[in-house]
Amino acid sequence: MKKMSEIIATLKKDYIYNLMIKGKRQDGRGFKDFRDLKLETNVIVKAEGSAKVTLGNTQVLVGVKLQTGTPFPDSQDEGVIITNLELNPIASPEFEPGPPREEAIEMARVVDRGIRESGAIDIKKLCITVGESVWIVFIDVHVLNDDGNIIDASCLAAIAALMTTMVPNEQQGLGEDVPLAMKEMPVGITIAKIGSKLMVDPSLDEEAVCETKLTIVSSSDGSVAGMQKMGISPLTEAELFEAIDLALEKAAELRGLYLEGLAKSE
């Protein structure tokens, strides 16, 4: 016999699913609407760069640290980027202490790939001495509260943190500190599919009933820098192109709002 909590959870999922099939969302948003977005920068004093993003009730904190190290053999004049994402136990009853979950590793890869493939950071300017010394950029993403769409919030927080990062040249005797050389602002947009409906920024409840999710990271020129599908339900070719068009539209919108928010927070 099912527990009462399981029965309530099933009824809730059915309610949300039926609403969406009718073209409605539990919180009253349209299918193309994001939840309220709040950005704070320079929130970690000892980090070279940091940002906190609140998307609805989802909260993500990102800290950026730089240290010197040796370059990879096949890219001796380029700096190194290392991205880590932690699903803190305080963020959800589903997250437990211990080794990184597969889900966290997958999310970190999406954030990392978006930054790399878009050329967001001018990694050649992170070279100190070719073949000997480069800057290593550590991007640490901490999920503080999970109410859905962690990836989009993480992408936004990571880029905001990088855009406020100072390279600590002075402590290494390399001259004055300078801003991290940024060339691009990639934005990740996650689209959930429920029935035949596509919607942006799924909440935690919506993620529980969606059949598949597709995250599309794009650059400011509209090129796709990365794509990640989660879930077993397939997407038709028409749905894929519809999702890409929607992601590019929302990314352009969000990028403008975000740059405005960055200017205000500095």
UniProtKB/Swiss-Prot annotation:
GO biological process assignments: rRNA catabolic process
Keyword Cytoplasm: yes
Superkingdom of this protein's organism: Archaea
Cellular component, GO annotation: cytoplasmic exosome (RNase complex)
GO molecular function: mRNA 3'-UTR AU-rich region binding
InterPro entries for the chain: ExoRNase_PH_dom1, ExoRNase_PH_dom2, ExoRNase_PH_dom2_sf, Exosome_comp_Rrp42_subfam, PNPase/RNase_PH_dom_sf, Ribosomal_Su5_D2-typ_SF, Rrp42_archaea
Subunit record text: Component of the archaeal exosome complex. Forms a hexameric ring-like arrangement composed of 3 Rrp41-Rrp42 heterodimers. The hexameric ring associates with a trimer of Rrp4 and/or Csl4 subunits.
Protein name as annotated: Exosome complex component Rrp42
The species this protein was found in: Methanosarcina acetivorans (strain ATCC 35395 / DSM 2834 / JCM 12185 / C2A)
Gene that this polypeptide is encoded by: rrp42
